[in-house]
């Protein structure tokens, strides 16, 4: 590069030198002597005068040539200096320091009413909470129950206590009078979630009821799955609950296992502010959780759920009068082994990868009749698949194997693409529709 620059400078210097001298010669030839105008007649008729004029021009030209030689010398010196200069490399660009985004603040919204046993819920949350700044606890109280209010107030600044202001009765259809509690719950949820997302302006929230106890890695679980929820539009929630999470139906040696499910589990669940903006304008007057399970709300989206639940319920008292608790909820196993989820690669839960691998695993497993699964025949097969072909066969096989047999808008509890996976007598079983399955039938209720 320097050689090209030097050659260019020499060429331009030579051109300028020749052109300048030609112009000077023409100028001196036509210029009159200093102090007197030229006489044309004198020059034409007097040889001596002509000789003197030529001598004068030659002297002037000699002086100018000296000046040009000096100019040419300066050009040469400049070129020599340029050639002798050692090129220096540009200073290396400073490496860009990666900016680690600040961790998201995810509040825990505790929905409370008239259970003073909310202390058990709050004690566990505060015991396992890794950071008060990253996981503020907001207790939203309905019902106006003073003993519960005092229990919440006793935690001081460790929690934020807000109160649902509308404690009035709700007008309900005559055949729904016994369900007024469900109407009040839906009203409370709407108000409390509105406070979290519109008043406090948090980007996400984990909703728990006041009768839930959390696992040691409850916060770690939601911290790790929050980025996945934000990044994958095919997901709309993360739940801490496995509807089929009874102790004999989970693999206790694999607490790190997570799944996608088309069924909305609730009972400790993470949602984003964007989802609340979608749901709030059409929030139902009652039975909000079953409303969430309808296809109009789910829109083909899934939730993440664990193999072993990160919450358990201890509240027999409630609007369901304890029946569901006695039959099912009290048997759900709560995880006790801390899993460092934030150190795990959870990309396998993204829809494309999950569907490919999960379906290959399920339909690659040998098919076995439900009777042989129940009697633990063909143990050498290991993981197996039990195939159902309709609503009635699903319910019959589910009851025979001990899994939840109810359906909401055609979706089985913990199901994904119609498949319910669980442990039975020490081996993995997939209760699955045919491979040609085309979607849920909302009439299966």
Swiss-Prot record:
Disulphide bond pairs: 113-143, 237-303
Record-listed Mn(2+) binding positions: 211
One GO CC term, this protein: Golgi membrane
Cofactor(s) named in the record: Mn(2+)
Active site, UniProt feature: 289
Membrane topology field: Single-pass type II membrane protein
Segments in the Cytoplasmic topological domain: 1-6
Transmembrane segments annotated in the record for this chain: 7-29
Keywords: Cytoplasm, Disulfide bond, Glycosyltransferase, Golgi apparatus, Manganese, Membrane, Metal-binding, Signal-anchor, Transferase, Transmembrane, Transmembrane helix
Catalytic reactions of this protein: N(4)-(alpha-D-Man-(1->3)-[alpha-D-Man-(1->3)-[alpha-D-Man-(1->6)]-alpha-D-Man-(1->6)]-beta-D-Man-(1->4)-beta-D-GlcNAc-(1->4)-beta-D-GlcNAc)-L-asparaginyl-[protein] (N-glucan mannose isomer 5A1,2) + UDP-N-acetyl-alpha-D-glucosamine = N(4)-{beta-D-GlcNAc-(1->2)-alpha-D-Man-(1->3)-[alpha-D-Man-(1->3)-[alpha-D-Man-(1->6)]-alpha-D-Man-(1->6)]-beta-D-Man-(1->4)-beta-D-GlcNAc-(1->4)-beta-D-GlcNAc}-L-asparaginyl-[protein] + UDP + H(+)
Record EC number: 2.4.1.101
Binding site for substrate: 115, 142, 188, 210, 320
Self-association state and partner proteins as the record states: Interacts with MGAT4D. Interacts with BRI3 (isoforms 1 and 2); the interaction with isoform 2 is weaker than with isoform 1.
Protein name: Alpha-1,3-mannosyl-glycoprotein 2-beta-N-acetylglucosaminyltransferase
Organism: Homo sapiens
Classification lineage: Eukaryota, Metazoa, Chordata, Craniata, Vertebrata
Gene: MGAT1
